């Protein structure tokens, strides 16, 4: 039976999820949505957060610099040019992590930690594989380093196992939503056999890898490019932000394509093809995520911009 999703206080909803889960994963909101960032800051500043959560695992930092980040969030002085290496020397050749919202999270945790005793201070765990670019001088060097790390999703899973679960801690994971899928997607393409081969081995995202080891994860999608009100009309009346559990609701029974209408690009013998999620064969939303964080319609959202000094 389908019933309408109902909004709840998002901070309380996330913290309640930690009562039954050691890992809660939240989509970062399109790599730069300022309202998604504002929610994360409100969550971290909430006095209950540090009582329940020990670590924050982020996509936006190279784990090679973990020791330096530990010192920074603990309040030690770290030179600006040294600190920036954590997000500027990742495996990703783009400027997304230079958007102020990503550095801002590190500085916010540092600030929150000033009011916490040492044994309750929040730790930032950098999730990107530890590529040392000073040692990369050829494609072969990069392949070797990449193979040693094991991939952008398997590496943070190792970190969570070693630094969080083995130490009986709890972690908030902040990553792009496509890293948090439970099940693989099907894609519409001309060469369906090739696409199925490329995209449908065993699931290998962060959440699916953890759950394959019987570690249950509570996961939250943040819709910033589509309006959930197209799936359930009364969403327009919800306060922003709001959290909503989606199983058994119109929001949960909708196709994943309803939330992710974007193409990806695949390469084959005929060139590069633009492909989209197959809404019929792919798992529906409630098979991928437990809840959504509603921030308002896409037209009301704003985006973190690069500093003019970096443009």
Residue ranges of model-derived segments:
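Compositional signal for N-terminal targeting/processing segments
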Residues: 1-311
């Amino acid at each position: 039976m389908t019933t309408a999703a109902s909004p709840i206080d998002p901070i309380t909803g996330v913290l309640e999820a930690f009562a039954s889960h050691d890992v809660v994963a939240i989509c970062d909101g399109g790599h730069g949505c300022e309202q998604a960032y504002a929610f994360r800051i409100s969550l971290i500043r909430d006095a209950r957060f540090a009582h329940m959560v020990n670590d924050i695992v982020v996509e936006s930092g190279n784990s090679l610099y973990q020791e330096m980040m530990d010192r920074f969030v603990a309040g030690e002085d770290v030179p600006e040019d040294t600190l920036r290496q954590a997000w500027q020397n990742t495996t990703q050749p783009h400027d997304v992590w230079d958007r102020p919202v990503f550095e801002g999270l590190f500085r916010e945790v540092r600030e929150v930690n000033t009011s916490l005793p040492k044994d309750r201070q929040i730790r930032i765990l950098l999730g990107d594989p530890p590529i040392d670019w000073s040692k990369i001088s050829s494609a072969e060097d990069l392949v070797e380093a990449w193979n040693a790390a094991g991939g952008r999703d398997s590496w943070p899973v190792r970190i969570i196992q070693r630094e969080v679960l083995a130490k009986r801690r709890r972690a908030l994971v902040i990553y792009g939503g496509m890293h948090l899928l439970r099940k693989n997607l099907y894609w519409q393409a001309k060469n369906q056999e090739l696409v199925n081969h490329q995209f449908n081995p065993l699931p290998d995202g962060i959440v699916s890898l953890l759950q394959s080891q019987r570690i249950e994860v509570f996961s939250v999608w943040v819709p910033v490019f589509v309006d959930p009100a197209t799936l359930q009309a009364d969403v327009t009346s919800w306060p922003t932000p709001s959290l909503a559990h989606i199983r058994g609701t119109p929001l949960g029974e909708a196709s994943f394509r309803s939330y992710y209408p974007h193409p990806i690009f695949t390469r084959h013998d005929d060139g590069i093809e633009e492909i989209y999620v197959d809404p019929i064969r792919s798992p529906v939303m409630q098979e991928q995520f437990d809840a959504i964080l509603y921030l308002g319609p896409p037209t009301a959202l704003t985006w973190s911009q690069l500093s003019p000094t970096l443009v």
